[in-house]
């Protein structure tokens, strides 16, 4: 547990708390029992850990109000409980060369003006149980809950040279926030025949009529397939470059508030 001393700010006014843990095994069985926790602007470095959590609201890599900075190198991080993603971010979290497994919850959740970056990492998600206000199954979830745990702003997910597997629901889901998704040279698989590549729409959070999403999707040397669904209060800007390709339907119901597609001469949409 790393607490930086500030309950209201992310990475500012911290007291400099810095926790490093290496080559360890962490197992939790209770509810609200995450594997590693960072809050209040603290800093955590985790090297080659094996984390298993089985309770509800028990993310393997977890942050809370005030956020901080988390760097994870190698290891395996597994959750089986409801509302327990492999990563829950109200911080700036980077994961390198690791394995992330979520069996009941979303794989990664990013709340508000916070970030998750994965490099050379395998993420496998099954999301078999809905939790709280959730109405859809998904793997990577970017949103603003309005609880006060995270500042309002752009939620950001970046993945490079990684393997992303979705077994139930949408690969990416965005609601009630502005979001940026950066994808470079990943293998992205959705095994759910009804799952979308990306869904952006209103949901249970925020004020009705203004609680959709505004998404910028950047693809670099990236292949992807599936459908993209954008509702009437949401927007998408999609940038493809360096031999990127997307195969699937985009806004097939013609419902989006706006969609902008930008392709360089080496990229294509099929």
Could you describe each region identified by the protein language model?
Residues 1-29, 37-57, 62-82, 87-104, ...:
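Surface-exposed loop/turn motifs in large extracellular/passenger domains
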Residues 268-270:
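Class I S-adenosyl-L-methionine-dependent methyltransferase catalytic core
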